[in-house]
Regions:
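Residues in flexible loops and secondary-structure boundaries
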Residues: 9-13, 143
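Bacterial signal peptide processing site
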Residues: 20-22
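C-terminal motif of bacterial Sec signal peptides marking the signal peptidase cleavage site
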Residues: 15-18
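Signature for phosphate-centric chemistry
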Residues: 27-163, 169-399
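Sec-dependent signal peptide recognition
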Residues: 2-10
Length: 399
């Protein structure tokens, strides 16, 4: 049995692309019938069908192998950017008395969002370093749920003597996801601990770190989109690894410098619906005169400055923005609100009842999800004919 944890791809054999959020091995979770909220890639995992409805092995046959390729679980924001930039914008609107009653609520909600992300994983066993980019409790339960469903789906395979091979990209949240998955296997069936390889995936302790050396990390297989000389050329490469490395460099150059790609993304950004959608999002929050000022002199807002929180132990923790993310128009401001809306779907526990749905009309969410999907199609997906399969050649290690 092979278990691979990526940071970019979600797929699984035997329809194991979803999970329940219940630690009880006997629990059965019905598929979700909730309408889409257009969280796009931030959509929390849900079972796609009732476990009992999966096709059974034909009479006289039994499962002998399964492979799961999974993305990390639901996470928080990757860094202090959209939230801080919006907070700086909000403070200016507050100073000018340019907030609606709904807009008045946004400040406290942004503060709660920043605090939740700064403390994400704080005191949680299995999270190596708390803070931005970590899995949320929803994300942790997703991978525990996948393990539970696997045990129910293939009990005879997991009871066999075959090893359970686990690898990840080495990125913190991917490693942690793999560990929560294996921890649930061990919790439900302790004898499986001796079958999990390498040993570093059998312990939630932050001191147990999978590596290239123990076989628990393979960036050429699971982080191929971002290989670099410092991390990936320390040892001589095999012929196949060299091909993947070269393909990775070609992809990164394509993403940064390809003129056809830049032109296509520019065309997408000039969608005439963008301004109308931005007004739909911003008008209930900010007064019209303030919205008109966005992008004019003095009315661009970046993620500059810092935000300080106090965790349960009483010490102060300060996170600083890098100033690289800027709101230079109403369109930018609305798109940033969508980013917080979409991430909030997987942060229910951490946000403690704060709901960003009130800031994002469903029609607007649909627009931003479709816009992001279109960008991803050209940057990461099939792209266009002239890209010469540069977006797929990097994945040759998965063949």
């Amino acid at each position: 049995m092979n278990i691979l944890f990526k940071t970019t791809v979600l797929a699984a054999s035997l329809l194991l692309a979803a999970c329940n959020n219940n630690d009880d091995q006997e629990a059965q979770t019905a598929p979700s019938t909730n309408p889409s909220k257009y969280y796009q890639t931030k959509t929390p995992y849900q079972p796609q069908q009732d476990l009992k409805s999966y096709e059974q092995a034909p009479t006289g046959f039994q499962p002998v192998f399964t492979e799961l390729v999974a993305r990390h679980g639901s996470r928080g924001l990757s860094s202090l950017k959209y939230d801080l930039a919006l907070y700086n914008l909000w403070k200016q609107a507050k100073a000018e008395n340019a907030l609606t009653p709904l807009g008045e609520q946004l400040g406290a909600d942004l503060e709660a969002m920043m605090k939740a992300n700064i403390l994400l994983g704080y005191g949680v066993e299995g999270i190596r370093q708390y803070g931005y980019g970590n899995e949320t409790m929803t994300g942790i339960l997703e991978h525990r749920g996948i393990a539970d469903r696997l045990l129910q789906r293939l009990p005879t395979l997991l009871n066999a003597q075959a090893p359970i091979l686990v690898q990840s990209s080495g990125v913190d949240r991917a490693v942690d996801s793999a560990k929560f998955f294996t921890a649930e296997l061990i919790k439900q069936q302790p004898q499986l601990k001796d079958k999990i390889v390498p040993l570093s995936y059998t312990n939630l302790s932050s001191g147990s770190v999978p590596s290239v050396e123990d076989g628990g990390v393979d960036r050429f297989k699971l982080y191929f989109h971002s290989l670099n000389a410092d991390e990936d050329l320390a040892q001589p490469l095999s012929v196949s690894q060299q091909k993947i490395y070269d393909a990775s460099q070609a992809y990164q150059d394509f993403e940064e410098n390809n003129k056809d790609l830049a032109q296509k993304l520019d065309e997408l950004s000039k969608n005439t619906q963008a301004e109308k959608t931005a007004q739909m999002v911003l008008s209930p929050i900010f007064k019209a005169d303030f919205i008109k000022k966005l992008g004019t002199t003095g009315y661009s807002f970046s993620n500059t400055g810092s935000f300080t929180v106090t965790p349960p132990k009483g010490e102060q923790i300060t996170e600083k923005g890098k100033g690289k993310n800027t709101i230079a128009s109403a369109v930018d401001a609305a798109a940033y609100i969508y980013e917080l809306y979409s991430i909030s779907g997987g942060m229910k526990d951490e946000l403690k009842g704060i709901n960003f749905d009130k800031y994002m009309p469903l029609e607007a969410a649909k627009f931003y999800a479709e816009f992001n999907d279109a960008n991803d199609f050209y940057e990461k997906g099939p792209s266009f004919t002239e890209s010469n399969q540069v977006t797929s050649e990097i994945a040759q290690g998965l063949k």
